[in-house]
Amino acid sequence: MEEITQHFGVGASSHGHGHGQHHHHHHHHHPWASSLSAVVAPLPPQPPSAGLPLTLNTVAATGNSGGSGNPVLQLANGGGLLDACVKAKEPSSSSPYAGDVEAIKAKIISHPHYYSLLTAYLECNKVGAPPEVSARLTEIAQEVEARQRTALGGLAAATEPELDQFMEAYHEMLVKFREELTRPLQEAMEFMRRVESQLNSLSISGRSLRNILSSGSSEEDQEGSGGETELPEVDAHGVDQELKHHLLKKYSGYLSSLKQELSKKKKKGKLPKEARQQLLSWWDQHYKWPYPSETQKVALAESTGLDLKQINNWFINQRKRHWKPSEEMHHLMMDGYHTTNAFYMDGHFINDGGLYRLG
């Protein structure tokens, strides 16, 4: 802000950095350039200036409280924007430029960029405004443009480079200011749209809870009044099916991974009851020698729904905990050691190294 102000030859404020210190700059500068800092500050109500060369009575009284004192709507008699352009601070009566205010306003109004400046100013005031207010501001800009064209006619404005630069710089500031105002509003709207989308994804069959509740209460009222008009009923089964389908579609990946994880944990724990019953039945029938062949293991796996690893682990644990060779089997094994140190029994080869199955 200060860089732009200094660019147009405007010095420091009459109030210095310390109390009681005053700095006066006598180099040449233009009064309108000192108002750059006023664009982002609230504008105080300005009294109408009598006898202006061009009066812009473009704002009618509104229903808002203090409408005539609202700087946003103070465009009549060159208020609001013009005062911001002319006065960054209230000029004192002793100011050598106080008498030039009307001439400065006339130059600003007659400048070719005035309508662009006014449009940018009104765009700032449209941010967050209700639709009716935004529409009214657009009408104001159109009315001002029409009045400006009528008042100026075909007259060419006098060329004044420093005023041209000021109008361009002021317009650029207003555009940037509008962007700064719009950004948080857009972020808030985007956040609300995401929340609304998430809530809609959880709604049932696209109907809001309010509609469902209102339908239910209407049915109760109709039944209590004895009327015969049939109201639409909520198909609970259909709603449940649609909700189930929606949830399965949304969480199918998560459920699949969870199912696999539970399946792994299930394999590490106890076997299903029916599978255990079938294995115990086979165990009872072959208690004397509970060593199933590979063919028998495959058959047991198919009938129980278990895999071969589970079958093998079950028999190993079962033999360790619940089986000991009978006396007859023990004597046969011992006799085998004394003769050939090995013998065959039920297709098994037994020696001092343990039990082995042939082929």
From Swiss-Prot:
Q: Which gene encodes it?
A: KN-1
Q: Where's the DNA-binding part?
A: 263-326
Give an example GO biological process.
plasmodesmata-mediated intercellular transport
| Gene3D superfamilies, alphabetized | Homeodomain-like
Q: Which PANTHER family match?
A: HOMEOBOX PROTEIN TRANSCRIPTION FACTORS (PTHR11850)
Protein known as: Homeotic protein knotted-1
Q: In which tissues is it expressed?
A: Expressed in apical meristems of vegetative and floral stems as well as in the underlying ground meristem. Specifically expressed in vascular bundles developing both in the leaf and stem. Very low levels of expression in leaves.
Lineage, uppermost ranks: Eukaryota, Viridiplantae, Streptophyta, Embryophyta, Tracheophyta
Q: What is its quaternary makeup? A: Forms homodimers. Binds to MBP2C; this interaction reduces RNA binding capacity.
Q: Name one GO cellular component term.
A: cytoplasm
Q: Which SMART domains match?
A: ELK (SM01188), HOX (SM00389), KNOX1 (SM01255), KNOX2 (SM01256)
UniProt-listed CDD domains: homeodomain (cd00086)
Task: Kindly list the GO molecular function terms attached to this UniProt entry.
Answer: DNA-binding transcription factor activity, RNA polymerase II-specific; protein homodimerization activity; RNA binding; sequence-specific DNA binding
The region called Disordered is annotated at: 1-34, 213-232
